[in-house]
Amino acid sequence: MKRKTMIRTFACFLLAGGLAMLSGSCSSDDGNGGAPMIESVAAAADANLEPITVGYAANMYVIHGSGFSTTQKIYFNDTDTYFNPNLVTDTDIFVTIDRDTPYADVSNKLRVVTKTGEAEFDFIVAPPAPGVHSFNPINAADGQEITIYGSYFLNPTVTVGGNTATVVSSTLTEIHAILPAGSQNKKVTVTTISGSAEYGTAVGTAIYDDVFYSPWDIESWNNHVYVTDLSKAAQGTTFIKKSIEGWGNIQGNWNWNDQLSGYTGIHFFLRSDDPGKLVWIVNGNGWGNDTHAITTTKDWKEVRLTWAQLGNPAALQNISFQEFTGSTHNYYLDNIGFTVD
């Protein structure tokens, strides 16, 4: 079948609503009783039906070839895939890849089984684009190993500021990689066959990720605790929790860092078990100031503050937070550090 005929066929499928067998010009190809043969696969949404060898779950594709009129089964990576027999002619099959089709450690094959035989075709079902949850340690030195947490890490490559990192090992949810030279203040990107994801916190910018970096700390008299739970952390595996009474606070220690020229400001992540409000205080400025108030929910919220918003301080000396609803809430802090953009 010519490509323009395939396009016309697809249009006829749409007009028919997939509810009846094609007729007339939409079913001009008659079965010949021979064994099936797959010639190409194309995305159904592509008006030009350009041949491809990589597809994605929950998307429809056109299998083009011959001998399909008695199709009984379709398999992607040996997964039995539902198809509508009303969307089958002798030369074309419209089928949607099942969303649960596996993509790791699989055959990378498409198979069509008919009454007269079976056809096989090299075809990759790719995972969704990767997602980067976080990495640790943020303040790793060049040449040090980091652990990247996330999802859909199928055969990943890792770059830091455009420089290639050495992947030591990987699973679908975790990558161990060695930072290349020149990684400081650069961002980590994970790339797979399905796309790329860049993590927003740059290497070497942490005040707190899973631990505080000297000289910073929250002193024990604050009565806070550290919770280790990767599934609930904003960054890494461990975050800070404190039940703060109305108008109470959690205070960072006082110190001095005037090496700020490489940064554009600071950021931190906040959340609470129920709706709350915290006022941020930097270098002692902001107590009781409602213009510094941040509403919190059960979802992590990143707050980014530029040096201009902070009054262009000569040094960073302290970061603290004041409860601002007047009631007691459980508050959580994570990923406190400097920004580079």
What are these regions (language model features)?
Residues 226-249:
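Short carbohydrate-recognition loop motifs
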Residues 104-115, 185-194, 317-321:
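Short, aromatic- and glycine-rich surface loops/edge beta-strands on solvent-exposed regions
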Residues 212, 254-276, 303-305, 336:
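Extra-cytoplasmic beta-strand recognition segments
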Residues 21-25:
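C-terminal motif of bacterial Sec signal peptides marking the signal peptidase cleavage site
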Residues 27-69, 116-155, 185, 194-220:
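Beta-strand/beta-sandwich contexts
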